Structures are given as C-alpha cells and as structure tokens.
A protein has these predicted regions:
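Active-site-proximal catalytic alpha-helix in oxidoreductases
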Residues: 1-21, 25-38, 64
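NAD(P)-dependent Rossmann-like dehydrogenase/reductase catalytic/cofactor-binding core
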Residues: 27-119
C-alpha cells in the first residue's frame, strides 16, 4: 500500500520522502490512496492491518530517499505503474469498489510517463 501511495506521488511532485512528509496536505492524499487500496483488499477477502498513519510515518527515517518509481522516471526507465497502480485499479473495478483517488493518480502518472517518453 505504501509503495502505491508514495511512488506515483513522488513522480508527480519530484519530491523525496521527507519533502512529501513535510508538505501540507500530502499525508491526507496519500492516506486516501492507502485507504482505497485497503478497501480493495478487503473486497477480495484480504485482511491487511489498518495502520495507514504508521506506514506513512516510515518515510521519516529516510527523508532524502527517492522512491524507486521516481528514480526510474528520472533515469528515463519505464515506471512500475502497471504492477503498482493499474493492478489495484483493475481489482477495484472487478469488485466495483470506488477508488476515485487511485483513478486520478493513475491517469496523471500514466500521462506524465507518456509525455516524458515523447520528448
């Protein structure tokens, strides 16, 4: 869940873990992403701990760290959008779980990758 929330948001913002943790409103956005992911897991009968705040605070130990998705983007490599975001989106659709924040994140991140590759 954490990777799905921090990877794409770091690509969209260019921010490190520490910068995202300090940014007003970012914890709320990432928390919504993780909540939606948790709802999808529950819809499939997967019991995951509801420890979103604890998971989000893990970035405080590595403030200068760039998530792997941002590292891939900056290096011009293909990002892991499909296994990290698209899969959750497809699972949500199959169970008709509303995931508006994940849908928005997917559209923005996929577009950013297409635009970068076009350059």
């Amino acid at each position: 869940m954490l990777n799905m929330a921090v990877g794409p948001t770091s690509v969209l913002t260019g921010a490190t873990m520490g910068a995202m943790e300090q940014a007003p409103g970012m914890a709320a956005v990432q928390g919504r992403l993780m909540r939606e992911c948790l709802n999808v897991a529950h819809a499939w009968g997967v019991a995951l701990p509801d420890d979103i705040d604890e998971r989000l605070s893990r970035g405080s130990g590595v403030p200068g760290h760039k998530p792997s998705m941002l590292q891939d983007f900056e290096a011009g490599r293909s990002m892991e959008i499909d296994p990290i975001v698209t899969t959750v989106l497809e699972l949500a659709r199959r169970r008709r779980v509303p995931v508006p924040t994940i849908e928005t994140l997917w559209a923005l991140t996929a577009l950013k990758e297409r635009v970068a590759r076009a350059d």
